Amino acid sequence: MAQYKGAASEAGRAMQLMKKREKQREQLEQMKLKIAEENVVKANINKKFSAHYDAVEAELKSSTVGLVTLNDMKAKQEALVKEREKQLAKKEQFKDLQLKLEKQRERERKKEQKRKIASLSFNLEEDEECEDEESEEEEEEYVADKEDLPKKKKKKKQQLGKNPDVDTSFLPDRDREEEENRLREELRQEWERKQEKIKSEEIEITFSYWDGSGHRRTVKMKKGNSIQQFLQKALEILRKDFSELRSAGVEQLMYIKEDLIIPHHHSFYDFIVTKARGKSGPLFNFDVHEDVRLLSDASVEKDESHAGKVVLRSWYEKNKHIFPASRWEPYDPEKKWDKYTIR
């Protein structure tokens, strides 16, 4: 005999509708979260730009070795900015591709849901079987999409080609960038080798121990040596002849070159590379000529230089109001001496 199943079928249909509504609510929440994330990304555009230039500045500092000219620094900075912009453009293109793929999957998911809703069955057993089959189909489709994605990309790459008449130098090109990076690295290594060769060259430095009168000595140093290393060697030579230096240390000595007090951490290489100048002569020459202030035309710049003075700091503190110590002032790399002075 046929049995009455009205109540059971109604209950099954109600359960199915509740499940569908719950799924729709979850999808709506996911869409809201996605929109909120996109808004956050748009709001942080300024931060990305600031981070971009901070990264360029950091890269410029780390890749700069020793002192370089202003033109070299500008060229290096422009190259780093261009490279950084190319990297950001690649990232943006990759993000756009991901968003497009997500939107495509979302559209397919919505179509599938509409199809499911339209084909609802009031038979509970049939609904459960359909759900199992559909979930399996979705998983298979998702796996198939992931497998087909590289194939589609390959097909697009095969179909698209570059027009030889169009300038594409502004577009990202992995091969070209790798070649540029390789050349840049070769140039950097070659430049470093040249600088190391310059630093290892020997120079003869004439200096004068100044205690109110001059006592000249000479010493051989390398261009890469620091002022502190030079003073240490000079102190070893002078201790034999001057008793006040026997208990003195390097930190108690000062090096005066062209009326400028040179800090201990600078090297001779720094002044040679930058062609630095002092108040009364060039800082990049360490041999000695006649006093440039006694030549016929002192307004004409020459390469002649004076013997640098090695002075006890205690002597300077006592006599800094008296010539020649009254002319001395700390070396400032930002200050330019366009003309030599005698007062």
UniProtKB/Swiss-Prot annotation:
Signal peptide: none annotated. Residues 1-25, 125-181 are annotated as: Disordered. One of its GO terms (cellular component) is nucleus. This is Protein FAM50A-B. Disulfide bonds: none annotated. It is found in: Nucleus. The gene is fam50a-b. Pfam families: XAP5. GO terms for biological process: chromatin organization; mRNA processing; RNA splicing. It comes from the Eukaryota. Residues 172-181 have a biased composition (Basic and acidic residues). Belongs to the FAM50 family. It comes from Xenopus laevis (African clawed frog). Probably involved in the regulation of pre-mRNA splicing. Keywords: mRNA processing, mRNA splicing, Nucleus. Residues 125-142 have a biased composition (Acidic residues).
